[in-house]
Amino acid sequence: MPDSEPLEPLNQESSSNTEQLKLSTTPNIPARPQTRPQKQSTTTTTTVPTDQDSTTETSLEKPLDNPQDELDELAHEIEKVLSDPVIPPRPQHGSSTKSSETQTEHKEHDFEPAHPAIPQRPTNKKETIQSEVGDHNNGLESKSDLKVNKETSDDSVSTDKDKVHIKPSIPTIPSRPQSRNLDFSEVDNTKPSTTPSIPARPQRQSTTTQDEYKPQASNTPDIVTRPQTKTEKSVSNEELDKPGDEPSSKDQDNERHTDDSNASKSILETEKAVAQEEKKAKKSDVDNKPSEPTTSTDSSTEPTAPARGFRLPLHMQQGSGPISTSTPVAGSEAELNSLNNSNTFGDGEVTPGNSDTKATFKNDEDVENENRTDSSSFDDDMETISQDNEDGEQDRRNRQETATEENAQESEAPQFETTIIESGETEERDGDDTDSGELYSEQQQNKEKEETVPATSTPKIPQRPPKKSSLSRATTNDSLTSLNSTSKPPKPVISKRPTTEESLSNIEPTIPSRPAINQIPSVGESQHEPIVPNRPGNKDLASSQKDTQVSVKSKPPPPKPKKLSSKIAAFQQQLFNPANASSEEDVSSTGSKQPESGIRKRSTENSVLSRFGGKAIPLPGMFNPNQMPKPSISHGEETSDDKEEKQESATANAPVRRTRGPRGKKLPKAVADAEVKTESRFAIESGKLWSIEFKKKIVEEKEIISTSVEDLKKPKILSENDEAGDESKETAVENEVIDNPEIPVKDELQHDVVDVVGHPEKDVVTGLDDDDEDVPPEVNERFIKDEEISNVGVERTIASETTTEKHSTDEEEVEEEAEVDSVDIPIRRVAVNTVDSTEVQKDVEDEP
């Protein structure tokens, strides 16, 4: 339970803190930037590591009179901050759920100060606002706020975490708002909504220079050094204000990261520098305060635009406005910030060299713009800046009065037109960073002018193109009026176009602003602008020269067609003879390779292989000399005859020109379109020259059977052949070998004889082999038995006819041998038994 006891005072302190936060929501934002300018001078050398550390530093800075006491308090607070990591172990030691819940609640409060720490500061700002209502004097409000902060810090001593988070937020806020409350009383009325986001950014800016954004802690010391070199405190204060306004929300986010990363740095070292810088800041604030009342009225009326000149809707711009207003330091610095806020609405960040680019544009036009009280983007020109320095506060007051009138006229007009115009100016201004101190002071004065007339920039948008289009500065004033009248028919230059026209031209001004930006780089060319009219003159001259040249060329038309004809001929040669053209090109490209080809050619021509293509000697029938590729002839070896032949072929292929006769007459179509038909002298005829037929040889068995019958018919044949006489006797002697007739077959013989008589061809077959002497005896004996049956009745006749002689001439023997080969063996043997007769052989010879 001992842990729960200290938790009760923490809860009380947290409740008191929440009440303070509720009381101060919107005014807290301006209060912190007031205290921050003091830190900015001090904390430029150091960066706050965390939100808690930043709050502790602010609490230490409260008693500026006694820096040693503050250092002692800071040492105690630092120890408390170091004890913050002990927060997680507490719930570990306290096993009870209640203690853990209370600890988690306190942890939530501890983590909240990073986000809620911003609203806590506004609570102190409310106190500072009350002190502002009492007095705008030097630092009195800050002292009263410091006392209140000390009381709150004493209440938070019970717990380390609550002390660390609550104390730094309370004491730091009152000291700064005292200087800035004067400004914010005027500015906060217009921008009460964005307080929570704004205080967080100023905390980080405190580490940097008087800027709202802490991430520029490294960049801010450079900005501070610039005003110091210029040796004017007022200029330095104004410069500090502008860089504070310039840093964008991105810079603020970066500063948050840098604060966390820089937690390791010692706080004691930073506190000493902070105490000294705060004293310097107070002195500068006291000196700059008399200039505040002039700027307060302007800041309230003019909406601030985000940095970098981005265009936002009106409600967004009003919400983002307090971010820029929270940055003003004190006294004149706050006034300059308000001026910067009004100008940044369209201009974005105002860099030191932005005005240099426009100095060449409007040395002559600024006088008319001032008389017209126009808050155009051209008010930032060097001439307007110099005039502002000379005029002083009286000119500013006059401009403010004119601004109020113009605001009354243009209040109805949408204000994002101003953002469009001024955004172009910011882009123009971004380039130059030199002479930052002088430019800051001059630009701030110009911003005051613009604050007086925030919405009058719309009619001036068309004015930019006339300046660019104008050939000389002397004629720019006339050209501006003429261009305004041409671009937009109404010419209320003095009245600056009523709101109705502006509502109609809301879309239009964006278009002229873009060409204005593009034409800005041509400022250096303004001196050369008289040359621009000469250029169109030159173009006209060139066109006239071209016309003269065309006329000159048109005079001698006859030579032109000749040139064209020659070109056409060459072109047609390429079309009709691409091979020749390519060969000519190859000649030029391969001129260096000619000797090699000649060497190779000699080696192949002199060898036997060249006859067969140069590879190998083929077998007979493999090589066809007609198919062998022709050897490439080297260009150096070409004879003059070859060149002449090529030239002749080129001329032959060249199109022949038509003979020019009377142009009006044309040949009849029958003649012009005559078609030549060529017919060959040879007629083609087709027919069958020969044919082949294949047939099988048919052998009849009847012939074999008839052999036995042929033997039977020979008696009659013999009777018919009795006239032969003695020639057949020899054959009969040989046939005496037949003996022993056993079976008489007379009927068969008679029947067969009749058949044999009807078949004389069969007799031829039988009579062929009558005189074969080569037949072996065994074969004869085997067939004799078969023939005895048929020859029984004929034996006596055979015996009587033995006187017949054998017909054995050499020719007959040769014929018989040929016929014997074609006849079967059994037929031969049957013939042996028969009686040969010369008549039968004669018949055979006579047959076809």
Swiss-Prot record:
Residues 657-668 have a biased composition (Basic residues). Residues 11-28, 93-102, 190-228, 317-329, 541-552, 571-595 have a biased composition (Polar residues). Residues 377-393, 424-436, 810-822 have a biased composition (Acidic residues). Residues 1-676, 717-740, 798-822 are annotated as: Disordered. It is found in: Cytoplasm, Cytoskeleton, Actin patch. The keyword Cytoplasm applies. One of its GO terms (cellular component) is actin cortical patch. Residues 34-58, 291-307, 475-487 have a biased composition (Low complexity). Coiled coil: none annotated. Residues 73-82, 103-113, 124-135, 142-165, 229-290, 359-373, 635-648 have a biased composition (Basic and acidic residues). It comes from the Eukaryota. Keywords: Cytoplasm, Cytoskeleton. The keyword Cytoplasm applies. Involved in mitochondrial migration along actin filaments. Belongs to the AIM21 family. This is Altered inheritance of mitochondria protein 21.
